From Swiss-Prot:
Transmembrane segments: none
Binding site for D-ribose 5-phosphate: 59, 188, 253, 274-275
Protein source organism: Desulfurococcus amylolyticus (strain DSM 18924 / JCM 16383 / VKM B-2413 / 1221n) (Desulfurococcus kamchatkensis)
Function: Catalyzes the formation of pyridoxal 5'-phosphate from ribose 5-phosphate (RBP), glyceraldehyde 3-phosphate (G3P) and ammonia. The ammonia is provided by the PdxT subunit. Can also use ribulose 5-phosphate and dihydroxyacetone phosphate as substrates, resulting from enzyme-catalyzed isomerization of RBP and G3P, respectively.
Stated name of the protein: Pyridoxal 5'-phosphate synthase subunit PdxS
Length: 335
């Protein structure tokens, strides 16, 4: 990005943030409950997640896995009670991880520690913030407590990441205070196809909006925002930037170094890897290979080297998404 473009980006982002904060104050004036809690400035939140760009965040369930992730070069870990594949197999209600496990992971490694909360469950999120995690994932992998309303993330000092299958979903989550977006994909399947579909859908709409902006057709951007129930200012900023105004990671079904390189090639800023590493039979080598391929995704020789580090025979057993029932699709949760 050119220096001039960077200044324009920061100016537009600052303007947007002030408007979002004004909206928060308006909600407070209208009587909506807004606890008097310490909040970090949006730029601090965005600054933290920006430092994760180009890296890999790995799902873990214990300190031993977290140590493997750190030694492999991960930029962070995401602590769960069960890996997405096991959540899918176990059924029942999936909740946030055991606080003791999160604390053990935090004391075992030096890289940022994240954790998931259920969609709409403000007090799981508050517990995670009190524990001191660096990033909260309001995740469709866990069982939602509210299918129609997400957490008001402006009330937290900890940055949030949310999943999205489309640009309107992504912009709605950003409007709610998400500092980071990721593709939803279809977690726990070892099949990257849905993540590919989602990032292409997002990219398609961004390309379209950017075309409107370059042609001076702001009315078309306004129509898009109204038809898709997203704030016009966010749609306009996205159109001007030609990308999402926050960091956008890939997630859902990434199981090999080649999968990670593919998502980076499609425009992701980094990747989350869920079950793909620790449901495989070669987690240490696979973790190193995925980090290598993510870092050097634009160098085919290095991606080949990374792919040689893993064995297909050791890969997690994948799930054919076409055989899943509609109620089994996690990506449908919380739109």
């Amino acid at each position: 990005m050119k220096l001039v473009d960077a200044y324009v980006f920061l100016e537009e982002l600052g303007s947007l943030l002030y408007k979002l904060l004004e909206q928060r104050d308006k909600l407070r004036e209208e009587g909506y409950p807004v606890p008097g809690r310490e909040v970090a400035t949006p730029l601090v939140k965005y600054g933290f997640v920006s430092m994760l760009k180009g890296g890999v965040i790995m799902d873990v369930t214990n300190p031993e896995q977290a140590i493997i992730a750190e030694e492999a070069g991960a930029v962070g870990v995401m602590v769960l009670d069960k890996l997405p594949y096991d959540v899918r197999m176990a059924g029942g209600v999936a909740r946030t991880a055991d606080v003791k496990v999160i604390e053990e992971v935090m004391s075992s490694i030096t890289i940022p520690v994240s954790a998931k909360c259920r969609i709409g469950h403000e007090f799981e999120a508050r517990v995670l913030e009190e524990v001191g995690v660096d990033l909260i994932d309001e995740s469709e992998v866990l069982t939602p407590v509210d299918e129609k309303a997400h957490i008001n993330k402006w009330l937290f000092k900890t940055p949030f990441v949310n999943g999205a299958r489309s640009l309107p979903e992504a912009l709605r989550r950003i409007y709610e205070g998400a500092s980071m977006i990721r593709t939803k994909g279809e977690p726990g399947t070892g099949n990257v196809a849905e993540a590919v579909k989602h990032i292409k859908i997002v990219n398609r709409d961004i390309y379209m909006l950017n075309g409107y902006y370059r042609n001076g057709d702001v009315e078309a951007i306004w129509v898009y925002s109204k038809e898709n129930r997203v704030p016009y200012e966010l749609a306009l900023l996205t159109a001007r930037l030609g990308r999402l105004p926050v960091v956008n990671f890939a997630a859902g079904g990434i199981a090999t170094p080649a999968d990670a390189a593919l998502m980076m090639w499609l425009g992701a800023d980094g990747v989350f890897v869920g079950s793909g590493i620790f449901k495989s039979n070669d987690p240490e080598a696979r973790a190193r290979g995925i980090v290598l391929a993510t870092t050097y995704w634009d160098d085919p020789e290095t991606v080949l080297e990374a792919q040689k580090m893993v064995s297909e025979k050791a890969s997690m057993l994948g799930i054919d998404i076409r055989r899943l029932k509609p109620e089994e699709l996690m990506q449908e949760r919380g739109v």
